[in-house]
Amino acid sequence: AGSIKHGLEIMGLALVDVHANTCMMLRAHQTPSTKELKLRDMNQVKHYIDVISCYKKDLRKVTDVIVADAFFSIRTFVDGIKEHEFHLVSRFRDTADLHYVYTGPRSKKPGRPKMLDGKIGYKELDFTRMEKLHIEGLEGSAYTLIAYSKALKQKVRLVIWIMPNGKHKLFFSTKTSMSGEDVLYIYRSRFQIEFCFRDAKQFTGLTHCQARHKNQLDFSYNASF
């Protein structure tokens, strides 16, 4: 009952004000069914990239950062939005393959310069390579560094949040110039979109439309938002 049924879900594209902690829905798109995606010779992630590309001109006037949950922390999506000049703020799985970046002197030996300097072990973190973050209201402790993601094949601004129970969460931005504080603030602000969905369901009939035609459904979703 709680599983995702492609073709019966919608993708919401919204603008979030991190400082005011508010959200405004811009557009909703119905996710194509698996059959329709197959006919288009694309997958769900490619569909999401195409939707973003449709609004990139207007979005780029406001921001160059897209925030999304861990589902989108894959190379296909990161590379796809990079083509449209967007960076991603998201979360890695807790066991992500991440490496310290080598910052020492360049060797005079021939060949490719050394880039990686050991895998990040989450049970034995090297805090000398990190900067501790001081974030009001955050339980536990948080550290930031520039790390290399094997999955994304690129450097990222990484934030490691160590919770009071000893477990950790990994947040990142593909915009390495972004501060660790901003990575956390931006990722946490993405939950504001849930209030847009909640209000549309409770007050403006988001789930009440019984139409079957795609255009009618599209109008109903966006009118609700």
Predicted regions and their residues:
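An internal, acidic/charged active-site-proximal segment
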Residues: 33-157
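A short secondary-structure junction signal
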Residues: 25, 77-79, 100-102, 157, ...
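Short, motif-level signal for alpha-helix interfacial/capping segments enriched in acidic residues
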Residues: 46-50, 170-176, 181
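Basic, amphipathic alpha-helical segments enriched in Lys/Arg and hydrophobic/aromatic residues
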Residues: 209-225
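Charge-patterned, long linear interaction tracts outside catalytic cores
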Residues: 149-177
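Acidic, metal-ligating active-site segments
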Residues: 1-28, 158
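Short, conserved catalytic/metal-binding motifs centered on acidic residues
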Residues: 1, 13, 65-72, 88, ...
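Short amphipathic alpha-helical "interface-anchor" segments enriched in bulky aromatics
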Residues: 180-211
